[in-house]
């Protein structure tokens, strides 16, 4: 009711039924915005969306992406209606502190390699854009201070522009699934080979 800033990081990403994507992501966003309207609270609000909302490339048939896209449009409509500041972030894949075998390929691979557990890589050439969770948090502090970075999207590519209606954390890393697995295997063998894997910059 008296919030000065609202972060909407909630979302459904592994439902039992595909239709629950829309109920959980769009439905909750709608409820949240209605509650703000009820109390005439025009606090700035942030939406955690996904690169899948571009519905481009391999995300073209993503029910999750469609639900996130619907939530985005709801937020943009809310901004036009109320004049409130809205910051919509289309996050790529996240890496960092997270639980394996849930929704982070990097965490799953790290855990599997470290514990000699089997894992599957369907296509080693698949490229991921990764955002480190600590960089995401830093980006949220920047948003609170009015220093957010704006962008638009060309397919799944982020294009920085001061007039963009989206926001982004510009520090990301692009790597293939095969490169991730190979690097993890090199780290695992380091006590035997005594060779430190080559670390990418950044």
Give the location of each predicted region.
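Hydrophobic/aromatic beta-strand patches that form the interior of the parallel beta-sheet core
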Residues: 7, 46, 87-89, 167-169
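Short-chain dehydrogenase/reductase
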Residues: 22-26, 61-69, 99-103, 130
């Amino acid at each position: 009711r008296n919030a000065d800033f609202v972060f909407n990081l909630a979302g459904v990403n592994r439902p039992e039924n595909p239709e629950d994507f829309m109920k959980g992501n769009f439905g909750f966003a709608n409820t949240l915005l209605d509650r703000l309207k009820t109390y005439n609270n025009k606090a700035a609000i942030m939406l955690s969306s996904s690169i899948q909302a571009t519905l481009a490339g391999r995300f073209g048939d993503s029910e999750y992406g469609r639900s996130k896209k619907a939530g985005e449009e709801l937020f943009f409509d809310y901004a036009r209606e109320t004049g409130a500041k809205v910051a919509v972030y289309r996050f790529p894949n996240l890496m960092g502190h997270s639980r394996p075998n849930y929704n982070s390929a990097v965490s799953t691979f790290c855990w599997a390699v470290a514990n000699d557990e089997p894992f599957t890589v369907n296509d080693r050439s698949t490229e991921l854009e990764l955002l480190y969770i600590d960089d995401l948090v830093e980006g949220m502090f920047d948003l609170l201070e009015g220093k957010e970075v704006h962008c638009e999207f060309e397919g799944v590519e982020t294009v920085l522009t001061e007039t963009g209606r989206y926001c982004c954390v510009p520090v990301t890393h692009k790597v293939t699934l095969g490169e991730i697995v190979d690097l993890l295997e090199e780290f695992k063998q380091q006590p035997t080979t005594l060779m430190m894997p080559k670390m990418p910059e950044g």
